[in-house]
């Protein structure tokens, strides 16, 4: 890989994308155990012979889960942390933090508590902390997995900026469409081997069946369409009347009116920090500070009762994986689990080979599938998925979509917080749009509503805006 080159690594979950990034930043062999054959050279030096602090000055890493790379509790300290460890004078350090926030246009995220940021905002701070150190090589492991469409466009501009600065960029990613204009080469991995190296032009020539057979997501969102027909709305079973949600006395959403019927799959969209996760937590009874009425089958249902009838798959699934094996996780905390259902769900989601593995040893996409499997087995009537396709390849995304359709057929009420246009077109019947504390749009997922859906997901002319 030469200077100023942008190389995209793609392939199914667990194919070795993250392992390659760990080889380049020295985490293999200096942190992760295993057998290493062959050599990895950075600037002509073997990586295993370079001290970690010197590697960190040359190679900047943005991990798949930004939470794993934070060392501070506020955003300014986090951005400054790397350069602080280079012992820069306080004045230069302050200037670099200022320059970083200006270059990346994240002034609004300054002086914020990291624990109060949305997943997408955390991702921006993780990138900023690396950018501040001005490394020559950038490694990004699925940097878009927590971002809304507007933030993905901002990420694309950031990548364009560092490319202009003469940096080398290595990206492991499932979402491919936003990188087609930036990547110089696309490396396709399968089961730990390089199976193909393409130019963007060659990659565009792949037919849709070929691409799907390789387990790859769409390269052009303009070629993704919702179903033509719209099923009639079912009788409402869940109703929200005049619901207002607050966080630390600040109103997040106000006067929300909504109804949902059995079998409905409802997408929830909005920019990072619009209140989508707060809304989903309130549905499940996990958020206390709210006014208004929640009704189930026309009867008021209090917060504690909602806790009992609902299940939520969180954006960061590491928070809800507790057991020592994948199989045990699928029945963790469930009275009298149906073992036949457990086996069938593991098989459907491609998790049977990993049933004895500890969940924490799985890739990000595999962990996501485990959490989705639990939602299938738990038997609750109201299911909420917060970004269920973050970190998922095409195969896993279609498996999760199929599972959600099955849950819908079982009469579950399903809400999906997502930024994934491809997934929404495959699974959702409606999309709710949150913006500035309100819910201005409730849009059916049909061909008739395609222009509005593309507007909500910022899809334009085959690229995102």
Regions found by a protein language model. Name each.
Residues 10-12, 269-271:
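The feature captures the beta-strand-to-loop junction immediately N-terminal to the Walker
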Residues 113-117, 121, 358-362, 366:
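Conserved ABC ATPase signature
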Residues 91-109, 339-354:
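Conserved ABC ATPase "signature" region
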Residues 138-141, 383-386:
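Catalytic Walker B motif of ABC-type/P-loop ATPase nucleotide-binding domains
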Residues 173-174, 418-419:
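H-loop/switch region of ABC-family ATPase nucleotide-binding domains
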Residues 193-215, 438-461:
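Conserved beta-strand-loop-alpha-helix hinge in the C-terminal portion
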Residues 25, 284:
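Helix-to-loop junction immediately C-terminal to a conserved catalytic motif
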């Amino acid at each position: 890989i030469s200077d100023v080159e942008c190389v995209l690594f793609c392939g199914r979950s667990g194919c070795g994308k993250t392992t390659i990034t760990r080889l380049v930043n020295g985490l293999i062999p200096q942190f992760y155990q295993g057998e290493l054959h062959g050599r990895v050279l950075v600037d002509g030096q073997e990586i295993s012979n370079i001290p970690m602090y010197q590697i960190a000055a040359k190679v900047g890493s943005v991990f798949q889960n930004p939470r794993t790379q934070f060392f501070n509790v506020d955003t300014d300290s986090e951005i400054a942390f790397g350069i602080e460890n280079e012992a820069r004078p306080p004045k230069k350090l302050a200037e670099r933090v200022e320059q970083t926030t200006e270059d990346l246009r994240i002034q609004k995220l300054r002086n914020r508590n990291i624990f109060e940021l949305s997943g997408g905002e955390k991702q921006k701070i993780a990138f900023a902390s690396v950018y501040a150190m001005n490394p020559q090589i950038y490694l990004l492991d699925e940097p878009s997995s927590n971002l809304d469409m507007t933030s993905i466009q901002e990420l694309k501009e950031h990548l364009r900026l560092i490319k202009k600065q003469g940096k080398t960029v290595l990206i492991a990613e499932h979402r491919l469409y936003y990188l087609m204009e930036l990547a110089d080469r696309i490396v396709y991995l399968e089961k730990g081997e390089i199976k193909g190296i393409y130019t963007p032009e060659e990659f565009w020539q792949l037919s849709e069946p070929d691409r799907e057979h390789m387990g790859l997501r769409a390269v052009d969102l303009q070629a993704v369409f919702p179903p033509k027909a719209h099923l009639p709305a079912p009788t409402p079973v869940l109703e929200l009347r005049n619901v207002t949600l607050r966080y630390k006395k600040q109103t997040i959403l106000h006067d929300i009116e909504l109804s949902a019927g059995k079998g409905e799959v409802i997408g929830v969209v909005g920019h990072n920090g619009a209140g989508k996760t707060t809304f989903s937590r309130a549905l499940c009874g996990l958020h206390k500070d709210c006014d208004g009425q929640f009704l189930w089958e026309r009867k008021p249902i209090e917060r504690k009762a909602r806790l009992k009838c609902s299940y939520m798959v969180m954006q960061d699934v590491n928070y809800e994986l507790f057991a020592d094996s994948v199989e045990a996780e699928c029945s963790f905390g469930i009275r009298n689990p149906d073992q036949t259902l457990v086996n069938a769900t593991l098989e459907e989601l491609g998790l049977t080979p990993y049933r004895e593995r500890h969940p924490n040893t799985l890739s990000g996409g595999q962990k996501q599938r485990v959490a989705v499997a639990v939602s299938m087995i738990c038997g609750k009537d109201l299911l909420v998925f917060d970004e269920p396709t973050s970190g998922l390849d095409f195969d896993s995304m279609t498996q999760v979509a199929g599972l959600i359709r099955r849950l819908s057929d079982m009469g579950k009420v399903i809400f999906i917080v997502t930024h994934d246009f491809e997934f929404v077109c495959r699974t959702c019947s409606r999309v709710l749009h949150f913006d500035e504390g309100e819910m201005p749009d409730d849009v059916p997922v049909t061909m008739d509503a395609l222009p509005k859906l593309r507007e909500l997901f910022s899809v334009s002319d085959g690229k995102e805006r």
